[in-house]
Amino acid sequence: MENIAHHNTTYNITPICSDSSECSSMEMLPLGCKTHSDKSDARRNLMDTGIYTPDSNSDSSDPRSDSSCVDVSNSLAVSHPISFCNWTDEESSLLTEHIKTDLTSEALTSAFPNKSLALIIRKIHDLQPVLDWTKNEIYLLAGIILNDSNSAIRRHKHKFPCRNVSNLNKKFQHYKNMVRRLNGVDHSKWTKPEIASLISLIDYDLTKTKLQKELPNKNIEEIKDLTNEMRIHSNFSHVESVLFEQTMTENDPIEIVLDQFPLKNKETCKKRLLKLNELSQHRDMAKRRLDEFESLIQNELKQIKDSIDLTRLKYLLVNDLTGKQLRSSFPGISMKYLKLIAKEMGFDEAGEYTLAEMNFLKKALQENAKLKSIIDELPFRSQLSIETKINSVEPNRRRSVFTSQVDELLYMAKWYSSDNFGNLSRRRNSRYASKLDKPKDKASDIMQPSKLHLENEEVTEAKVIPHDKGVENMISDHKLKGKNNEQKKRKSKKPTSMVEVLKEESAYFQSVTGNRCVLKEGQKRKRERLMQIKLETKLKKPKSQNLNETNRIQETKKLMKCDVEPDKVKEQKSFKSENLKEAKLDASDSSIVSDVEISLKKKLNKIENEEKRSPYDPEDISTDTLVPLYGRQLYVNEVYETQPRPPKLSFREDTNIMVQNCSEISLTDTIAADIISQHCKNYRDMPISFPSLTIVDRNTNRMILNPMNKIRIRFLLYPQHSELFILAEPKSNELDPINEIKKLFQLHYSLFFSHSSKLKKIILSEYNKEIDISIEENDFVRFMFVIDKWNRLMVELTPNDVDIGSHDINEEIRAYLSPNEIKIPSDEDIRLDIFYSEIQLSTEENPISDNDPIEPSSPSFDLIKSMKRCFTHDSSNRLTPPISSEEDNKENEPPIESDFRNNNNKGSIPCTPVRLNTRNKMVVNAVKPENYESNFFRHLKEKTSVSRFCVQQILLRIYSRIVSTESRKLRSYKAFTAEVYGELLPSFTSEVLTKVNLQPQHKFYDLGSGVGNTTFQAALEFGVHLSGGCEIMEHASKLTELQTMLLNKHLALLGLKKLPLNFALSQSFVENDIVRQAVIECDVLLVNNYLFDVNLNTAVGKMLYGLKPGTKIISLRNFIRPRYKASSDKTIFDYLKVERHEMSNYLSVSWTANKVPYYISTVQENICEEYV
């Protein structure tokens, strides 16, 4: 083994002072200095002349500090006397070069033989106070470690004169740990000088050119292998950063540029490019290089995808995703690329773990493995996913384990008593003990106090002890010992045991409960009947959401009036049987009635004075408010043509394209059903007559999702499209399929039938209310009839001439109905004649009134009745397959098992399919008028307002399908910073944008748009000319893109116009010219500055400088601080006139339930006078 460490240099110490006793401290003093004051003065004079410099080991930065005087026998002693000379320019430049390359003692003394080491160190600190480690210093340190890793670094301190002990020890331990990782690794091809050279280049230069120059006998692959074993970091040094910027500026291909940095992975290079992208002078270059970088990664990903066995990867995604199996199956392939390929194949890192992963995780937890090793062995899982799975596998991992029930009881008693009475309180002393446990390796670094040097006279005087004082001390010690003996004789109190504590607490519990008597030994507790308190008022039944405020108050009044009837009061007071005659009310009864009436009047006044719901937060279409259109077109352009028609859409049987950036739409939208299936633990079964959420798989005997529990709802404009739901009841605030179905009914009314109050009543009473009643009464047959009515109504009323076939879209779930329970909705059931007549009428002929009865009015056309056969194979029935009615003969019906509807069968799929009779039935149906389509589109053209409830529900439908399931990730940001995610609810956006009078000709922008809710709402509800937003968070930006794609497809299905959106995602608005240009042109600006700090507020003010007068800025905090005065800085704050407002609704933001204040700042033409 070669020895590459510098040999110890022997220095001759020439004492200047003639007195050997005074030179024992190894201080260099002029001749004749003998006293301590003379030494101090002489040291100070030498420091003033620049000859004496304290040892660099001292932590003091002041060279004149007396406290920095330490033993300099090794560092300041030289083989020649101290010379009084100045530094020439050549020597200074040479020393500057040494500061960059080599600061070892051997290099400094050889370069400046006529200078003392103390003078050299002082000059170095004058030239550069903060010193970086040089390459040769690290080379020397690495050589010391490689030769003798157990050597103490203090023995080699003299070789590093510019480093103090703590800094040197820290560096020594860092490289020692790095070299220690080579133990057990075959590195016989490497010599010690080569390893030391590689270590010296870590923080200096690891480019390809430098590596080939320093290590000519090694290729790049060998160097990569050794650096991987040593776990050398891949951060850019200063030299590498400069070279990276230069090479990126050139026109060389990206592959050649990356080849110059062989030890830097692509992620590190990409992060460096992103930092360059933040600089305005490099933005164009960085953007171009980032595009090249992405294409390079995609090409590599494609090559890897073509080279590996995808079938094998699919198998491993289901069975084994441990790192060991993946590395053996795909040797040499990066786990990052494998994970990207797996995600393209539908892999979800938060999904179910494979059996091999679970076995490994359990084994690792049993062996108490570290979390880092578990993460390394599960490369396809994130740290958050692994921690969540660990908590679910071993939820009681940190709980105390008791050997018996008595130990557990005593443990509980101990903590219970300490919390309530303080008898056995114990405080954890580890934090105090940790201060006393000093590491052994640092004990040698503690500086020993210097010995006190006293004169002979001072020593003699110190030895003399006053006799009187000694006698007094002896007397006091004797008294103290006597008191200690008395205290020792006293008997200590008997400590309270845990059992006694339990008895005391049990006695206290008995004294406050039951008959409040403490039980004695052998006594039993008396049983007393529990006191029952009867409520004075009746509990109100839950009302369906389709009742408006007026109807609810009227129903409450009726119920309360019934409660004060004399018969009911008499019935409550009477204790006789029902056969006795009714008695007249006496004076006492009448007084009771009057008291009840008074209490009821108070309740009525309270209900009438109850705060009304905010008009900006409608609950349903009965409490809806309207937003004026101001002449803008709400629907697609085809609606406003001379011959209106729904635009043609391309449908495809692919459930994934709903969240893809393409023009095609899935024939069946399964997003809502997928959410329920992926989070089925958050749902429970519907009432017993409804299909169960899960069933038992007969093959595996495990619970699986019920494949028959599927319900589909058609759309009006495109009845061939349907939305799929799984019937289940959410346990908390998850997506509710029943509410989604009811809201979809109301959406169709608001968009296509809002001109008719009769149709509103039909939607509310015969669809929404019927669904509520069917669930409350546990009637699945009634529920399915409502769904069938709606699907057939959509088919009959659609203005789109499409062939949707004759198949039953709800065939699976209809298997839970017997043939006698299947009811075919007729024209009368779906009120088809009323719909036709209401659509034929004009707005003047059909004024909206909530009091209109649901009866067919006198139509403006002759309603044609015809006898026709329906539900035959060749008919146009598009709801169900041929089904027999109850009046048909039942001879051909198959036998039905009597216990099919039994509770025991709930959760199982019917084994025998139901055979249906194909006999036809003669019914009377209404025929669609010839001018139906023109009148239908006429109502859409004549719309002058849009439903606020409709707009908000469209946005909430998108939000619940995209954002709600990812809300936890949105909150994984540092608290109380500008990146904290907080949502402005739709009611807030509606109110504030109405307050600023936002109109279609305006432009809107949201600085900090989050997932894009306010930007979407400004475009959809107010129809602005352009709606934009900027967001810096990666996950929120991704959700914005997904919401945009899904929203555009939902708008197309509803016939609404595409929104004009302009987002700047995954980027900051600070020093962003593109965002600033878009903001300057807008008319209304929203800034959620609730958690902006002073610096960010100042940056926003400078960014907004140049807004045109009249622009409105909405913020949650006032931009203008108290006593603000205008300055020379170019900021918009000097031109703002601020008004404070308060929300009318309590629930308007996500972080509080209180009414939130907000500020509207208007830009003025000149600087406001109050700021001058």
Swiss-Prot record:
Provide GO CC annotations from the record. nucleus
Q: Does the keyword ATP-binding apply?
A: no
Source species, domain of life: Eukaryota
Q: List the disulfide bonds.
A: none
Domain DOT1: where? 846-1172
Q: Where is the composition biased (Basic and acidic residues)?
A: 473-487
For region Disordered, the annotated ranges are: 47-68, 473-497, 873-911
Q: Which UniProt keywords apply?
A: Chromatin regulator, Methyltransferase, Nucleus, Repeat, S-adenosyl-L-methionine, Transcription, Transcription regulation, Transferase
Q: How is its activity regulated?
A: Ubiquitination of histone H2B to form H2BK123ub1 is required for efficient DOT1 methyltransferase activity on histone H3.
Q: Where in the cell is it found?
A: Nucleus
Q: Which reaction does it catalyse?
A: L-lysyl(79)-[histone H3] + 3 S-adenosyl-L-methionine = N(6),N(6),N(6)-trimethyl-L-lysyl(79)-[histone H3] + 3 S-adenosyl-L-homocysteine + 3 H(+)
The Low complexity compositionally biased stretches are 55-68
Q: Which PROSITE patterns does the UniProt record give?
A: DOT1
The UniProt annotation places S-adenosyl-L-methionine binding at 981-984, 1004-1013, 1031, 1068-1069
UniProt-listed GO biological process terms: DNA damage checkpoint signaling; DNA repair; methylation
- The keyword Transmembrane helix is annotated on this UniProt entry: no
Checking PANTHER family in the record gives: HISTONE H3 METHYLTRANSFERASE, HISTONE-LYSINE N-METHYLTRANSFERASE, H3 LYSINE-79 SPECIFIC
Functionally, this protein is described as follows: Histone methyltransferase that specifically trimethylates histone H3 to form H3K79me3. This methylation is required for telomere silencing and for the pachytene checkpoint during the meiotic cell cycle by allowing the recruitment of RAD9 to double strand breaks. Nucleosomes are preferred as substrate compared to free histone.
Q: Which family does it belong to?
A: Belongs to the class I-like SAM-binding methyltransferase superfamily. DOT1 family.
* Additional free-text comment from the UniProt record: In contrast to other lysine histone methyltransferases, it does not contain a SET domain, suggesting the existence of another mechanism for methylation of lysine residues of histones.
Q: What is this protein called?
A: Histone-lysine N-methyltransferase, H3 lysine-79 specific
- Report the source organism: Debaryomyces hansenii (strain ATCC 36239 / CBS 767 / BCRC 21394 / JCM 1990 / NBRC 0083 / IGC 2968)
The top of its lineage is:
Eukaryota, Fungi, Dikarya, Ascomycota, Saccharomycotina
